[in-house]
Amino acid sequence: MVSFFKTPIFILIIFLYLNEKVICSINENQNENDTISQNVNQHENINQNVNDNDNIEQLKSMIGNDELHKNLTILEKLILESLEKDKLKYPLLKQGTEQLIDISKFNKKNITDADDETYIIPTVQSSFHDIVKYEHLIKEQSIEIYNSDISDKIKKKIFIVRTLKTIKLMLIPLNSYKQNNDLKSALEELNNVFTNKEAQKESSPIGDHGTFFRKLLTHVRTIKENEDIENKGETLILGDNKIDVMNSNDFFFTTNSNVKFMENLDDITNQYGLGLINHLGPHLIALGHFTVLKLALKNYKNYFEAKSIKFFSWQKILEFSMSDRFKVLDMMCNHESVYYSEKKRRKTYLKVDRSSTSMECNILEYLLHYFNKYQLEIIKTTQDTDFDLHGMMEHKYIKDYFFSFMCNDPKECIIYHTNQFKKEANEENTFPEQEEPNREISAYNLYLNYYYFMKRYSSYGVKKTLYVHLLNLTGLLNYDTRSYVTSLYLPGYYNAVEMSFTEEKEFSKLFESLIQCIEKCHSDQARQISKDSNLLNDITKCDLCKGAFLYSNMKFDEVPSMLQKFYLYLTKGLKIQKVSSLIKTLDIYQDYSNYLSHDINWYTFLFLFRLTSFKEISKKNVAEAMYLNIKDEDTFNKTVVTNYWYPSPIKKYYTLYVRKHIPNNLVDELEKLMKSGTLEKMKKSLTFLVHVNSFLQLDFFHQLNEPPLGLPRSYPLSLVLEHKFKEWMDSSPAGFYFSNYQNPYVRKDLHDKVLSQKFEPPKMNQWNKVLKSLIECAYDMYFEQRHVKNLYKYHNIYNINNKLMLMRDSIDLYKTHFDDVLFFADIFNMRKYMTATPVYKKVKDRVYHTLHSITGNSVNFYKYGIIYGFKVNKEILKEVVDELYSIYNFNTDIFTDTSFLQTVYLLFRRIEETYRTQRRDDKISVNNVFFMNVVNNYSKLNKEEREIEIHNSMASRYYAKTMFAAFQMLFSTMLSNNVDNLDKAYGLSENIQVATSTSAFLTFAYVYNGSIMDSVTNSLLPPYAKKPITQLKYGKTFVFSNYFMLASKMYDMLNYKNLSLLCEYQAVASANFYSAKKVGQFIGRKFLPITTYFLVMRISWTHAFTTGQHLICAFDPKGCTADCKNSAPCYKSPESFFFTHALAAEASKYLFFYFFTNLYLDAYKSFPGGFGPAIKEQTQHVQEQTYERKPSVHSFNRNFFMELANGFMYAFCFFAISQMYAYFENINFYITSNFRFLDRYYGVFNKYFINYARIKLKEITSDLLIKYEREAYLSMKKYGYLGEVIAARLSPKDKIMNYVHETNDDVMSNLRRYDMENAFKNKMSTYVDDFAFFDDCGKNEQFLNERCDYCPVIEEVEETQLFTTTGDKNTNKTTEIKKQTSTYIDTEKMNEADSADSDDEKDSDTPDDELMISRFH
């Protein structure tokens, strides 16, 4: 009882004790945490101080940087000097000029001493506002005097004056900080430039802003509701008065010669806070610089007083990598984002709410996005030159690579003096000759770069323009202040705005987005525009939209506005509707050839129009609308041409329909749109090398060729090539990659190397070496014929016949251009080309072809094809396709993608007809059928003329088809917006393995990324290209692999390196899979009636399992009532639908046969060439008394029928025990297999699930036996090797001992010494045992390790004495022995002095008794 009461007290004491310990522990932990937090806070304070100092230092690098100030001053002086010496002496000092500008801040210069005309130039004392007015004067007078002769001079002057204005603006905060040493006052002084105007306008040119926009929206609403107006978009832009096409000069400038109007534009933009954009333009460097300064003033307290947000200068931001630039921007704009290395900025940006983002951050987001694109575009373009860069390289390495290429050394040099810079074609070389580039002067020297820009930039070609911009980019990326200053006058940083027009929308549709933005702003808040907006006030999206509208739509004196001029230029001048069509034809860093360069305000117009014309601009901010707009770039452009999943029969008939209904004059119109030399370039794009008649002699006419002496007649060359592909496919599961097929003996040992996991990817250029040996062998056998030898080798080749000369030329051309030769094929249908063929035979052939195709497909319908070889001249072809692609982009209102392709095809047909001058007109001519249409004196021509004759002969029939195949590959690739992403996808590490896989077509990544096999057959190539790779029995896989190689070359031309490698790796594997798939598909569809019968039976049994009664009484087995539907349920067993034991006995029989067919089919896993050939290797010494089997191809051979039987056994076994699985396979048979898209994905599913189950089943059945056979085979082989080695060691001794002991005394071998030596020496030379050594030998087995290094001679003597030959004078000694002795004589050191006349005796037939080997008793 006492203990009962003590228990709660004891528990209470324990609880209090533990509680105290816990509290103490918590307090200790708290103290520790406080200490840690104090340490952390100390570190944070230190970091904060560093960050604070960093912020201030970053701002000082922009407005307190002495180096920047020095370089800007230097460039300012250079510009002022160049303006004074400029050949264009404008602007002139006219009456009224002094009222426009303060003439005291300008210098006046006379044009000539004899002329009273005076022009003015700015000075160092000229302010920013003075340069603004000076720019207005230059534009006014340039418009008045403009002509094509001075076009480049006007452009250059406008560029440098704009640069001078930018420099004056950049120097304002620099000079202010230098004088006052106050950061904020320097920023405010810059801000006052756009707020404190010298003369405040009393009234706006548009009156009250609110009233103006209300009237505008009412007018827009009226037009949209008016059903009589057809083109509402054009009416919104041009108004009621239709404007005709203006003079071409009117398109060069945004305004006409009216300075007052220019000033009104400046005032409008200042009122809406867009003055900075108006005066600077969309220059990526300058606009970014001032936008960052604007952000610094706006958030000065957070950046530099509260010091809570990180700040970076614009120059520093550009030094970061492309992805880090956005991270830095988010830090400056106080945004929190989650970054994924593999995700695009667009995706991460849109995941975070950016509704409160300031306009400055939006503009910086835009500038960074397109600066990154500008950087990538320049780097991508270098791939067209002799050196390659990639976007992910470190900036230092980009610089080193550039100078290593230009200067042959990573050290800087003056690139304008290097050979790389000078060697661009079609340019006058006026540079001084230097052996070594000058390295004493920096490559970024301000004077040097400005001098060459002013002197020669207008004459630069594409490559030199690229080098100049790339030089500047390397400096920017590596924080070089001189490059930062030099960039201010480079055109590429203005032109980058063109890259933002990517959507395929009409210009009027983009303008409607701007109107929607204004409508949204007007509906949300009806307020008066603040007239004193400045840099400190927020520039809202509404300010941007309304300001952009007024800037682009203001006009005077009924002169068209900027918007109207640009729209007329597109629709009336160029006759296009989409801005993207124009932009795609322009270079991003071009020279002065672009008309926009006449007036930089064109770029300002495009920039403002771009910011306000995104589709979602009315609902989102600028950056969000931009990223939502480019979201379509990730969407696959699915058209009939580009969509590889589009049903091929529909695509084929649609293509033929479009071709048939193309207007006759459309081809003529296309020719007019092309340049004058393009047709000749088209002819030179292809060169035919291997004549079709040459290949036919080894293929179709192979039976006429004489076989080599003692050898059987050779098989057709296409059959041999096809067999090689089939053989590789059969052997690939065991790891016999074809790159080792050069040596047939190595191939037998490759299976052992598979275990070492040394992967050798199947690259086509290695496989081509194997095919080359086969092709050369076939030609060599042809030239070894007796009649060919007599004609070709033993007679003058001048009188040789044309056919033999054509054969020799074809093989010589093939060997010379082996790496570039591609083989195409066409159907060989003689009856189709011969007019003498009766009509009923043609109808019969057509009916047979139809029946053959309907019940399956047209696989193997023809044995032979017309195969020919050619090469592509990639540089010329690329120029042709680029021009045609530009024509298509400019004329999308005339052409669709399909109609343009077919128009080009008809143009190629027209070119093909120009080659038909030497062809007979009658189609019955045998020469026309077999393409022997070379000139009659072909063999008498020289080599160059014969090569031209081969090309003309082949081009007369196959130019159009071959050229169009190459063109469509390039055109459809350029048309698709999916190729960039696809190329990046196959550059990832996980997909590189897919590209090199021998079964890539059964992987999800391969199918998901477009299945390059289906892309080649259904998108990249025209429909007629599928005929030879399906209908030919011999050569279809060979031709398909060449399609892959053509695709590889085309992708390489477009700089898609990963896709190029993918096609090269898959040229054999995917081509084999396609051929095997077609054969299986053909026979599979023949079983439609049988499959349907069993499906109906299965449905009836399913009904019986679920209801107990059969649906169809005919399938009710005997024993049940005749009236099955009215009988009592006797089959009801729902679980039998999933698994049934009733048919287990029958299923086991089929499982048994399935097991043994697997043994035959899977033998390749362990035995190269199969189990049979492996066994035959042990009997190679026995001559095989049988005929040589015909090489196998992808057709209905023994293996195919074994696989068919294997499939039947599998179906009968597993379909019987599981109806659910049977229905699954029925769905595949009836639906999935008939739709290519579903079939490809089912193949992947089948590999990972169904085939996985089959593999596991094989592992416990047939694979066990195959492995046992392999081990037994190797054991027998090793035992055989052991026996051979033992026999090889004993054989020489046994044979000599047998000779000594068994030879009859009466029968003496009358052999001379050298006969004996030669006999035994030859015997010993054939014995090679690799110096194997036997371990653990007993005393009686030691002889196994003895080797005979010399020819043995055995002498048998009596036990008492050994006698020598009577003629041996030097040997008189005797040796006593007790038993038979073996003596080894070194025949090489034998004393030849004893037989001086032996050499003469070798030719004698009489025996030499003195040299006989005799026995003595």
Curated annotation (Swiss-Prot):
UniProt signal peptide: 1-24
Record's compositionally biased regions (Acidic residues): 1394-1411
Segments forming a coiled coil: none
Subunit details: Self-associates. Component of the RhopH complex. RhopH complex is at least composed of CLAG3.1/CLAG3.2, RhopH2 and RhopH3 with a 1:1:1 subunit stoichiometry. CLAG3.1/CLAG3.2 mediates subunit association through independent contacts with RhopH2 and RhopH3, which do not directly interact with one another. Interacts with RhopH2. Interacts with RhopH3.
Pfam families in alphabetical order: CLAG
Keywords associated with the record: Cytoplasmic vesicle, Disulfide bond, Host cell membrane, Host cytoplasm, Host membrane, Membrane, Signal, Transmembrane, Transmembrane helix, Transport
Localization per Swiss-Prot or TrEMBL: Host cell membrane; Host cytoplasm; Cytoplasmic vesicle, Secretory vesicle, Rhoptry
Extra remark beyond the main annotation: Many Plasmodium falciparum strains have two highly similar paralogous genes, CLAG3.1 and CLAG3.2, that are mutually exclusively expressed. CLAG3.1 is preferentially expressed in cultured parasites. Analysis of blood specimens from 20 Plasmodium falciparum-infected symptomatic patients indicates that parasites predominantly express CLAG3.2 in natural malaria infections. CLAG3.1/CLAG3.2 expression patterns can change under different environment conditions. In Dd2 strain, CLAG3.1 activity is inhibited by ISPA-28 compound.
GO annotation, cellular component aspect: cytoplasmic vesicle; host cell cytoplasm; host cell plasma membrane; membrane; rhoptry
Region (Disordered): 1383-1417
Disulfide bonds: C333-C361, C407-C413, C517-C545, C521-C542
GO BP: adhesion of symbiont to microvasculature
PANTHER family: 32 KDA HEAT SHOCK PROTEIN-RELATED (PTHR31802), CHROMOSOME UNDETERMINED SCAFFOLD_55, WHOLE GENOME SHOTGUN SEQUENCE (PTHR31802:SF39)
InterPro entries: CLAG
Transmembrane segments: 1204-1224
Organism the protein comes from: Plasmodium falciparum
Known role: Participates in the formation of new permeability pathways in Plasmodium-infected erythrocytes enabling the uptake of nutrients from the blood plasma.
Membrane topology summary: Single-pass membrane protein; Peripheral membrane protein
UniProt gene name: CLAG3.1
Protein name, per record: Cytoadherence-linked asexual protein 3.1
